[in-house]
């Protein structure tokens, strides 16, 4: 930056002040896209902030680098640099770029697409290639005249002014790496045209590219970039020939390949379940997860839960199929899984004994052609040895899911023909072969040799594969029945469908009664507790067949965690832990992630201002343009489920007493009294305080962000009384059906007022204080919106640049303190028992059965 320019001097002084935050740094990157010097300085400044802050802004940084037409390559190089340093950053960036590749498939000639394509391929090379020479070959200076002339001038000037070479030299070199402007050749255009005419399959093309070759010179996705031909792994004679950095790169590459295929496998399960009737989805899901467990333990984790401060993470050892739950959804099939992990078990430090052996195994090409988590091939007799090679520690040469019992054999005949089997399928019954039970008993007793245990483990995996294959066959037949329903009598179709579904459900009852295969190291003294846990779980499953997620969310998280630990073959490890995530496909979660960013920004403001309000931060991992992982909010249940369950219990009690069941729906206060005791007790008062403080926060957030679709299925109450809002598909400028039906500023129902009771004035007072706090820090919210609103594909930015202008208006910055208090009172008055809120809840109850 020229020091003679007074404006730049003031700007530099501001950049170097203590008040210049990471958020301001991102905002100024957006404001100065065409000033190469400022851009490079800001990227250097951004690199000085903690990684946690940098990761928070990854969506904004990617949006800027793709949509801000700039000659500077500083931001692109900054992103690559961060990905080199941190695996979490590389993974998140990879997924976001993949989603943008799909978005931009219809604009193959745009600069956005070219930048995205270049970055996407560079990230692939970075994370999948184990050879440093391949990565370094991507860092050569291109034939750019202007940077070359500037660099020559800097070198000449550096003779007299050495500082000039030190400061400006790296900028010129970085700019020299900028790819020259050129149009893709005709063959590239043909490839792009195929991508653009089939947008639904573009993500599948990306997946195929990753699975087959990761990055190839002639793949459709890479569009024949001028890059060296890449193979799946680089050939080495021995790990001894590798430097420490190269060994670390081998471990990172191995992690990325397994992690991405693991997440693909989870998403594919959800997609396959779409064709399965709702009554049979739970059984099918658990069979799929049983097969997935054959590849665990593995070098995979849940990126949402990684530590920011070190390249050490948890390692997934098991996903308990019995605990998996289908969430209520008519169109898509999101599901919840309980993931068992060992904390601090996954690292990329090559000098540990375990990682040394792993590096040697990788570079020796033993797993060169191996595909992890490939659930499309369910031949139970293949790749058994590979599935038992994943280790947890040096003392355990074989891992895998040791707790999955053999379930059934003979769900459908092996040679069953779909076109001929419907008439006879209704007579098929599920049986658990006695030989399977005998195997479990031997393993449970611990009286067997290692060879016996290995054989039993392999047989268990064979049976799990058989079950999955037959479950899929049954699901296919069910979908075929729906397709052929008009060509056969309706009664016959229903009979066959019911028979198949009942048999699949009977499988669950059989499984709950089966003992598990435990490793010898497990303490069998807890068997009584395990049987009790199975009985409890069995009762829950029977009681919630119509709503399989109900029991999952009603059970206390810590009790569930302890129950699963006792029944787990890995529960005896001191670093064992349990995490819960939701796998969701068929929905773009980038807007949800952005909403969570904004809500977290509110939370930080209130924490800094020490306001006594409460917000629950949510984490979401975007894994594509229509998929992702969502952190589960534990110990919380929706208001809909609360009212539905209490109403059902009340009516059953009335019928048991010989009374005519009434039609009145219970209130939230009934639940609070049931959950927290007498309204005058200290426990109830604390829950009331928690409700009040969280209601204030979400009332202000709902108004400022214009959160819509606030029915009772999207509002939770946790075990401490806090209210929590979820599902942010409608905010800022988009509304359900593009109709402004929810015109109240926020949701403040009679239920809420009944819980507040005599503390309504306290609610009003805290609303005013919390609103004033966010007004003073409005720029922290508005800047996030301003950065993202241009050229965004998210529905919430339908108004374009007017989005941030409308948000600014809602902050009412022109008002004084007294006028601001009056404004908040007016908002509360409009929201208080709003007729629009009542009508929307009634509409949801009539159309979707939401209480």
Curated annotation (Swiss-Prot):
Domain PIK helical, chain residue ranges per copy: 1-123
SMART domains xrefs: PI3Kc
Protein name in the entry: Phosphatidylinositol 4-kinase pik1
PROSITE patterns, per the entry: PI3_4_KINASE_1, PI3_4_KINASE_2, PI3_4_KINASE_3, PIK_HELICAL
UniProt-annotated location(s): Golgi apparatus; Nucleus
Record-linked InterPro entries: ARM-type_fold, Kinase-like_dom_sf, Phosphatidylino_kinase_fungi, PI3/4_kinase_cat_dom, PI3/4_kinase_cat_sf, PI3/4_kinase_CS, PI3K_accessory_dom, PI4KB-PIK1_PIK
UniProt region (Disordered), positions on chain: 384-404
EC number(s) on file: 2.7.1.67
GO process terms (BP): phosphatidylinositol phosphate biosynthetic process; phosphatidylinositol-mediated signaling
Gene3D superfamilies noted in UniProt: 6.10.140.1260, Phosphatidylinositol 3-/4-kinase, catalytic domain, Phosphatidylinositol 3-kinase Catalytic Subunit, Chain A, domain 4
Organism whose genome encodes this protein: Schizosaccharomyces pombe (strain 972 / ATCC 24843)
SUPFAM superfamilies: ARM repeat (SSF48371), Protein kinase-like (PK-like) (SSF56112)
Function: Acts on phosphatidylinositol (PI) in the first committed step in the production of the second messenger inositol 1,4,5,-trisphosphate. PIK1 is part of a nuclear phosphoinositide cycle and could control cytokinesis through the actin cytoskeleton.
UniProt entry tagged with the keyword Glycosyltransferase: no
Segments of this protein annotated with the region Catalytic loop: 706-714
GO CC aspect terms: cytoplasm; Golgi apparatus; membrane; nucleus; trans-Golgi network membrane
Region described as G-loop: 564-570
Pfam family name, one: PI4KB-PIK1_PIK
Main location: Golgi
Entry keyword Nucleus: yes
Residues the record lists as Phosphoserine modifications: 202, 219, 222, 235
Record's subunit section: Interacts with cdc4 and cam2.
The PI3K/PI4K catalytic domain, residue ranges: 558-836
Positions with biased composition (Acidic residues): 388-399
Catalytic activity: a 1,2-diacyl-sn-glycero-3-phospho-(1D-myo-inositol) + ATP = a 1,2-diacyl-sn-glycero-3-phospho-(1D-myo-inositol 4-phosphate) + ADP + H(+)
Family of this protein: Belongs to the PI3/PI4-kinase family.
